[in-house]
Curated annotation (Swiss-Prot):
The keyword Coiled coil applies. Residues 56-97, 434-476 form a coiled coil. Residues 103-425 form the Kinesin motor domain. SMART domains: KISc. One of its GO terms (molecular function) is ATP binding. Belongs to the TRAFAC class myosin-kinesin ATPase superfamily. Kinesin family. KIN-14 subfamily. ATP binds at residues 182-189. Pfam families: Kinesin (PF00225). Keywords: ATP-binding, Coiled coil, Microtubule, Motor protein, Nucleotide-binding. This is Kinesin-like protein KIN-14B. GO terms for cellular component: cytoplasm; kinesin complex; microtubule. GO terms for biological process: microtubule-based movement; spindle assembly.
Length: 830
């Protein structure tokens, strides 16, 4: 500290004395108070000496601490530069390692036997590290080659050890795709989700992403999206619900290309996430909305492809390949054939759509493997969505699952054939043994180099952390702009004033690039097919004026959070707990429509949301170890506004809880409450639920408990018609008319059931004025036959007589033809 402040304190009495000369015209009390202040500030000579010594000591200490701080800062700058260089080397080594293994790799996993399956089945497979030998006959075997084979005793950790390097490359700026392929019941969902005690690829991969990002010196923005492709339509599983459209009116999201050549899905919800628990919560919400149905292969078969996208954005990171990368984890639909499912109707169409998209995926991967000039991305919505994540420098993994059961042999052969096609194995492409040995040696060296560089990065990060703690001890805690990448802590008011012009320019560029020529615009038929004619494009949609108050929350509907019996990552969760989050009161569910569709709405708005504070654990949040300038924060804010990224809490809180209930995973609308007055007005006894009592000869409704006043004649007529079985319930009576004397009488007898006066009719042919309620004196049968006789015409009588004569002639001819003549019948009478 400089000695200037101490000198100023010593000169303060003289300064105040000089000021008194300019203020003599003021009151004497002010002059007296200033004099007391001067006396208090005037130190004695010993006190002055002590103060000077203290000032000199403080100045020396501050000079020494400033030197230490400067030294620590220089070391931090050097270590950060060294860490950036080593991180770049690690990225290049890992990329070379994966390129040497192959950008498109295919693994095979054989699930173990179920308890209900026969263990006495003959062994179909003979395995080694990279080959599957299938025994198709007693003396015939067929070989299938893979990059890695996992037997029936392999664990989830064994599978993830091969997947982990690919997931790490997503942090380096590369797009990654991980597929799970196989027939229904072969273990796809178990490999991807796992169980709470044995997590699968999806939860392990997400945990790895957050752990690696927390150890990195860069800040990352993670966004989570979840969608399904059902019968060629793209459906957002995280879109806010709307009760204006039913399940059958859900439109398909459209696919667009951005100026950088990437693929963007229009109106797809992207939610910012900061921890594994937030991703887990969103994943559980999305899996309950998947389209599932019962087939011969599985009672809860998925009827669509489920795609999970995690986008990673890190600006000003020179060691990354791209600023934004994508990690796709896809649970494909079952690849079983029609012979296996025996599906008809809608299930048949769903199976066709799944197999067509799987075939298109095989064509694309085969074209990429063989480096064909044309790659057929446009043959399927699945390949269109993944276009920027399959080719170029992207990393792709295909996990093929097969069943050991002998009953699934045909499906196993088809699955292995698809895997062989994806790997593009050719006889002439087999490498010589010397080349294979050299490749294996190089892989081992690169793997060891990657591990060494990772350990070196960890040591440097540890040193940086210790130096930062030392600096904090010397200078105290320094306020930073951001301590994590949670976008909810952004100072939006400051950023709006600084970057409004940049955001406006970026929006204008995006709108200009989204305009299509006339010949490229969709036709009316295509818009009707994908459901675009029911909504207005976002670029042409006018924003409503901002109301003074918040918009009523009845615009959107949210799900009822039903308790899930199964564990969150258990494979059965996606089928048993699947339900529709909202209900449309105008939609009537059909019996034939057995598929549980994932969406009830098409129109929704981009919203900003976040998790509750108690769910944000500090150890799960990714923190940065260096202070970043405000320019990077502005760039991230611009990136968020350009892509329409939303936060998770506001998005969840702005939805409305709609009352829905489920019955066997089917959507059932809640029965609206009915008042007692409405019951009196609208209750009509059903003709099929009437019961007669012998004591009072009254007709009662079994369901409503309503009494019908009817005469004894009519009650006996009902009993007689039951014995004769000639009249139906529809012919006997019609819904009675309600006769009230006045509305006041109804209000006065609310606690009593109203009395209904029945007006019966005997048949539909009788006229109303000829009906009588008097008890007939003759037998009912003769009475009805007499009426029928009067109603019979001459033509009817003639036709009956002719029919009788014709039958008699036929009988006579028949007896003569078999030798039974007049003598035979005469002998019978003797």
């Amino acid at each position: 500290m400089d000695v200037q402040p101490a000198r100023t304190m010593r000169n303060l009495p003289d300064t105040l004395s000089s000021l008194m000369g300019f203020n003599k015209h003021l009151t004497p009390s002010w002059i007296e108070s200033v004099s007391h202040i001067i006396d208090g500030l005037s130190p004695t000579k010993p006190q002055m000496k002590v103060m000077v010594e203290k000032d000199e000591n403080i100045s020396d200490d501050n000079t020494e601490s400033e030197a230490k701080v400067q030294k620590i800062q220089d070391e931090l700058v050097s270590l950060n530069a060294q860490l950036k260089q080593i991180t770049l080397q690690r990225r290049e080594a890992l990329n070379n390692y994966l390129d040497l293994k192959g950008n498109i790799r295919v693994f095979c996993r054989i699930r173990p036997f179920h308890h209900e399956e026969s263990y006495s089945s003959r062994n179909l497979f003979t395995l080694d590290e990279s080959n599957v030998f299938l025994k198709v006959a007693e003396t015939k075997r067929k070989q299938y080659k893979f990059d890695k084979v996992f037997d029936q005793f392999s664990t989830q950790g064994d599978v993830f050890s091969e997947v982990e390097p690919v997931i790490k490359s997503a942090l380096d700026g590369y797009n990654v795709c991980i597929f799970a392929y196989g027939q229904t019941g072969s273990g796809k969902t178990y490999t991807m989700e796992g169980k709470p005690t044995n997590l699968g690829v999806i939860p392990r991969g997400i945990q790895t992403l957050f752990n690696q990002a927390s150890e990195c010196n860069n800040r990352f923005l993670f966004t989570f999206s979840m969608l399904e492709i059902y019968m060629g339509n793209i459906r957002d599983l995280l879109a806010p619900r709307s009760k204006t459209n039913g399940i059958k009116n859900v439109p398909s999201l459209s696919i667009k290309s951005d100026p950088d050549g990437g693929i963007e899905i229009e109106d797809l919800v992207a939610v910012t996430v900061n921890s594994f628990q937030e991703v887990k919560r969103l994943y559980e919400m999305g899996t309950r909305l998947r389209s599932t149905a019962s087939t011969m292969a599985n009672s809860t078969s998925s009827r669509s492809h489920c795609l999970i996208r995690i986008s990673l954005t890190s600006l000003n990171a020179t060691e990354r390949r791209k600023a934004t990368s994508k990690l796709w984890m896809i649970d494909l639909g079952g690849s079983e054939r029609l012979v296996k499912t025996k599906a008809t109707g809608k299930r048949l169409k769903e199976g066709k759509a799944i197999n067509l998209s799987l075939s298109a995926l095989g064509d694309v991967i085969d074209a990429l493997q063989t480096k064909k000039p044309h790659v057929p991305y446009r043959n399927s919505k699945l390949t269109q969505v993944l276009r920027d994540s399959l080719g170029c420098e992207s990393k792709t993994l295909m996990l093929v699952h097969i069943s050991p059961d002998e009953g699934d042999l045909c499906e196993t052969i088809c699955t292995l054939g698809f895997a062989t096609r994806v790997r593009s194995i050719r006889l002439e492409s087999e490498e010589p043994p010397e080349m294979k040995a050299r490749k294996e040696t190089l892989l081992i060296d690169l793997g060891q180099k990657v591990n060494d560089l990772e350990h070196e990065c960890e040591d440097i990060r540890r040193k940086i952390k210790n130096l930062e703690e030392s600096m904090e001890h010397l200078t105290g805690p320094q306020p930073t702009i951001y301590s994590n990448f949670d976008m909810s802590h952004l100072s939006s008011e400051e950023l709006k004033t600084d970057v409004s012009s940049n955001v406006r320019n970026s929006k204008n560029r995006r709108e200009a690039s989204s305009r299509l020529p006339r010949f490229m615009k969709p036709t009316a038929s295509s818009q009707h097919r994908i459901g675009l004619n029911n909504r207005t494009p976002i670029i042409n949609r006018l924003k409503p004026p901002v109301p003074p108050r918040r918009r009523p929350s009845s615009v959107y509907a949210e799900s009822v959070m039903v308790p899930v019996n199964a564990a969150p990552w258990q494979s059965e969760c996606s089928s048993e707990c699947s339900m529709s989050l909202t209900s449309d009161m105008n939609w009537t569910p059909s019996i034939r429509d057995g598929t549980e569709c994932s969406q009830d709405a098409s129109e929704y708005e981009i919203k900003q949301v976040i998790f509750s504070e108690h769910e944000k654990s500090s150890h799960d949040q990714v923190t940065c170890y260096t202070d970043y300038p405000l320019a990077e924060s502005r760039d991230i804010q611009i990136k968020i506004e350009e892509k329409g990224i939303v936060d998770i809490d506001n998005w969840l809180h702005q939805q409305i809880v709609e009352k829905t209930s489920t019955f066997r995973s089917k959507m059932v609308l809640d029965i609206p409450g009915v008042t007692e007055a409405e019951i009196h007005v609208s209750s009509i006894p059903s003709p099929t639920t009437m019961a007669c009592t012998k004591e009072d000869s009254q007709v009662k409704d079994e369901v409503m408990g309503l009494t019908l006043q009817s005469s004894t004649d009519y009650v006996e007529d009902i009993k007689q018609s039951k014995t004769d079985n000639q009249f139906t319930a529809k012919e006997l009576c019609t819904p009675p008319f309600k006769e009230f004397s006045s509305n006041n009488e109804v209000k006065g007898h609310k606690n009593e059931h109203p009395v209904y006066h029945g007006r019966p009719r005997r048949s539909l042919q009788e006229e109303l004025e000829n009906c009588t309620l008097e008890k007939p004196n003759m037998d009912s049968k003769s009475h009805r036959s007499h009426d029928d006789k009067h109603k019979t015409g001459k033509f009817t009588k003639f036709f009956q007589a002719l029919q009788t004569a014709w039958i008699g002639a036929l009988l006579a001819l028949g007896t003569v033809s078999i030798g039974l003549e007049h003598g035979f019948f005469q002998s019978l009478t003797l």
